Amino acid sequence: MRLTSQIVVYLLFLFVACMVCHGEVARLKPDARLLTSFYLLLSAGGAAGGIFVAIIAPSIFQTFWEYQLGIWAIALLLVLILFRDPTSWLHGAKPGLLAPTATLTLLLLVPKYLVHARILTIPTPLSLAYNFVLGLLIPVCIWFAFTGGPTWTRQRKFRWLEITAVGSFVLLTVALCLQIKANNIYTYRQRNFYGAVAVNSNWDADMIHVAYEFMHGRTIHGIQLSDNRKEPAAYYGERSGARIALLTKPQRQVGAMRVGAIGLGIGTIAAYGRAGDVYRFYEINPAVIDLAQGKKGYFSYLQDSAARIEVVPGDARLSLEAEAARGEFQKFDVLFADAFSGDSIPVHLLTKEAMALYLSHLHGPDSVIVVNVTNRAIDISSVVAGLAQEYGLKATLIDAPNRSGIYLRSDFVLLTRGKLLDIPEIQKAGHFMRKDRHIAQNRIWTDDYSNVATLLRFR
């Protein structure tokens, strides 16, 4: 129910925010002679907001602080509206208004502390409600703390209300400090137009460094061990579909291989490269490329690989289309599509047209496309199964369990026209995918149609 709770809370907040903002815009609308200036300023405000979110925020924030600030700003606006409205309950300052503030604040601090202490690695749905209530309480507490509140608190000497207000203000300040400190637990952090990336250091009980984790948003995209830096970890361990696809490929036994990868991460699959092999990565995010190439000093899979490494910056599909237009078909023996495990799904890489492009870049019928469908919120495997059926491909799903936090749970779908899936090791590890009710209920994604909502895991 975690995903369901998050969706309900987020949509509820969005509804409240839209009602407050649009309601105030409608209330403040001037008479006809000033409408031109009114709509001009309204348009300028929308443009300014877009510029702030798209350009300024990624430049000045290392994480998505504009979202938190937006929640607080909406709550502050709501308080100011209630203060100014003579008919509101806040304008009248009814007795007992702030009595439960301290208790409420402490209750709201609990989920924040659990996330900060990494007892909870994923924020609960309460986090959004926390930020909203925080924005509501801060101006009220400041007002009580520095003005003494309404006259009835001074006339009746309800000093406990002022004490509660000051105490709550202090607690809220601590909460803000915890929020800021929670974003400083990472060894390295950077944000650009494509999102926020971070590197986290893992230590054991004896404070010996164990591994570096690469995170994009809230999702781990790669792990490299400190004591065995050439060991593939995270989603590419010994029982993963990626490893099985690479090591059981007959071409590996007779000569060099050409391996392509849509999505670089930290380049973990390069650890399987041998002398003479070519591993070609397509990556759109320059920050990810810098980390994978070792420019920050955390990851070295690309540097340590015996294979020849090629990194193509830019959108993978556009790059592959440009190569095809030039007649430069890559003839991959194995093509990895590993761009679907994060917080957002690049839909254009999972369409019917995209699959046709991938197939055109394969070496032959025995080549294989390996799709990483590991995702805690979205069932991507049904889309891949539908594409396999559309193009007459054999498909098998290989899942590997989480082991010790270093080798993460992974789900890979192997697609081929040849006999690779008949190899006993793959048959033992995989589950052949056939048309089922999930595929039947979903249309094949195309460049003109996609529907992520139908793939959400509501559990």
Model regions: which residues?
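Alpha-helical transmembrane segments of multi-pass membrane proteins
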Residues: 1-433, 447-459
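ABC-family ATPase nucleotide-binding domain "signature/switch" substructure
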Residues: 292, 438, 442
